[in-house]
Structures are given as C-alpha cells and as structure tokens.
C-alpha cells in the first residue's frame, strides 16, 4: 500500500512539473546570441517553435507565444499593416498553428476582454513605466489584428463575426477613454480588424459608403478620418441587426 501511495505521489509530481514547464524563446533580442546573427532570416529561424511543442501547447499558451514573438513589432515596419501581418504569418509557425485551432476565436476574445479589463488600472498607474504602457498598447493592438485577419475570418460564421465586431467596438470605446496613450497607431489595428470583418460579411457595405479611401482600411492604412467615421457607422449598424 505504501509503495502504491509513493508511486502515485511521484507520478502526480512529475505530471504537475510537466504541466508547469512551458516552452519559451531560447534567444531574445539584446542577448549576445541575438546580436551575433548576421541576417534577418537567422533571427526568424531562431524564433520558430519546435513541432512537438506546437502540437502539445494549449491554445491559450500558444496565444501567449504569438504575442511574445520577438519579431512581432516588425509588423509596423511596413507601409501597410496587412503586408506586415502577412509577413509575420509567413515567417512564424506559431501563428499559423494558432489559426488552425478550433478554439482560437474563443481564446482571443477571452484574452481581449482580460486586457481591456485592466486598461484603466494599468494606464492610470503612476508606478507603471512608459515602456510597460507601450507594451500594453501593442499587445491589445496585436490581439485586435489577430481577431480581424483574413486567415481567421475565412472559417467563421456571420454571427461570430458580428460578435467580434461588438467586442472590437467595446475596445474602440475603451481606447477613447485613454486618448493620450492610444492616439496614432493605437487605433489602427482596431480599424483594420473591423474593416476586414465587415468586408468578409458583405463586400458591398464598404463600397456603398462611397468613400474612395475606405477600402484602404482593409490594408491597415488609417489616414482618412472620413473613411473611419463611415466604418464606425457600418460597424454599429451591424451589431444592431
């Protein structure tokens, strides 16, 4: 009996350790190993998640890895957000795996709500550094980008898409509560996401707006207040249906 009990304790301990041990990126920006890379492709290669880890990592943990991807910020190195996201999608096996998960939308919406829930306490906290606030803004924007990307939208029902638009509008309104922090790039991902979902739901909606710049929102080019205003009107009308 004692031997059986000991065996159960050991098995439980090993299982718990395996559950707690999570994969992390072995080489990070700023380290000597990272600085030693000669090419961008070497950095991309170093950030790939091993196949066995990809298949065994939970969707929630995989989302964490996608948000922690060392080259994620490079999305903004492109003139158009859509090009930046497509490069990220092409270069990183983690986001490609994430988009195949049947519970990807659920994980994204849950995480988005969590992030929005801590916005006020985080951004209004004098102890929180500007770097930490910047990380928060970028993290929220990345989640919005994921929610609206065509790779995710292709397999969603119209009802789910409308629910996501509703979530994004909640985030849009929350961001307006902290304009000093989100002004500029802080709104681009939200607009990009909603534009792509609206276009997937009904491509004629953007065309009916009769604004020559509104389709530019599909690429993440948010430089025309009139087109954003039209998109806002369309978005709010969708969630009232």
Whereabouts are the PLM-identified features?
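Short hydrophobic "helix-edge" motifs at membrane interfaces and signal-peptide entry regions
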Residues: 4, 21-22
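Sec/Tat signal peptide C-region and signal peptidase I cleavage site
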Residues: 14-18
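Sec-dependent N-terminal signal peptides
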Residues: 4-13
